[in-house]
Amino acid sequence: MEKNCGSGQSKLKALRMHIYFEVDFQEQAQHYQAVLHSRGVTVDLQPIEKLNARFLRLNPDLALCVDENGLWLSANGMKMQPDWKAEIPRLKRASLKSEMIARACQLGEKPVLVDATAGLGHDSLLMAYLGAQIQLVERHPILFTLLEDSKAQAQRDPFLSQFMDRIQLIFADSASYLKQLDQEEKTVDVVYLDPMFPQRDQNQQAIKKQAQVKKQMQLLHLLLPEDGEMDLGGHLLELAKKVAKRVIVKRPRHAIFLANQEPAHQWQGDACRFDAYFQ
C-alpha cells in the first residue's frame, strides 16, 4: 500500500510534461496522465508512429514515454526508468556479510528504515531484500510515479515479488515526513540519506564529472536540477537524528561530512563510505 502525505508537491513549481506513446499503448498513457494529474503535473499526450532511438534523438527535450516496459523518462536521445528488474543479479550476489550497507544499517536485525533520499530506489531495493522494512520517501511527482511503476512491475516478477511487501512508497517531502514522525513521537530504527548531489571536497573538485555519471543519473539530474528545488540533504540530518536511533549517510569516499558534522563511525569502501550518527 502506498501512502500520500499530501506534501509531495507543495514546494515544487508547476510541472508540465509530454508523454509520447505508440497507438497500442494509448490506454496506458492515459492511465499515467490521470495519475500524474492527481499529483499536480499537467500532461500532454502525444501519439507517435514509432518510439525508437531516432525519435528520441530528434526530440531531445525532457519528456515521458510509454512502451511495453511501462513509463520512462527521456531526454537527449536517452531514456531511463528505475528498472528494479535489472538489479536482480546484484541482489542475488548480495548477503548480509558481503554488503557494507548491511553492516552500516544493521540489516540483520530487520530494522524499520526510512530512506529519505529515494533516488531510483536501488539501495532501498537491496536493503529490503536483505530484510529491512523500508519507507521510501519521494516528493517529486514524476520520480515518485516512476518508482511506483517500477514497484508494480516488480510485484509481477517471481523473484522480486517475494519481498515487495517490505517497501512502502510514500509521496511526501522528506523533511515534512521526518517532522511529522517527530511531532507524533514516532521513531524508526534507521534513517538512510544518500544525497543526489554530494557536496564538493575541500579542494572544491567535483566528486564526479557529469560526463562520468551513468545514463540514469544524467536524466535524473535534468529532472531534479541541483540549482533548483533539490538540495544537498544537509538539513535532513538534524531531523533524522530526532526520530532514529541510527542515521546512515552514504557519501563519495573523499566527500566532506554532510552538514560538516563528524560521524560517530564510518565504513569505508573503494568508491564510497557510510557515515553513522547515533542517538
UniProtKB/Swiss-Prot annotation:
GO cellular component: cytoplasm
HAMAP family per the UniProt record, alphabetical: 16SrRNA_methyltr_J (MF_01523)
Function description: Specifically methylates the guanosine in position 1516 of 16S rRNA.
Top enzyme category: transferase
Protein name: Ribosomal RNA small subunit methyltransferase J
List of residues binding S-adenosyl-L-methionine: E138, R139, D194
Organism from which the protein derives: Acinetobacter baumannii (strain SDF)
GO MF terms, alphabetically ordered: rRNA (guanine-N2-)-methyltransferase activity
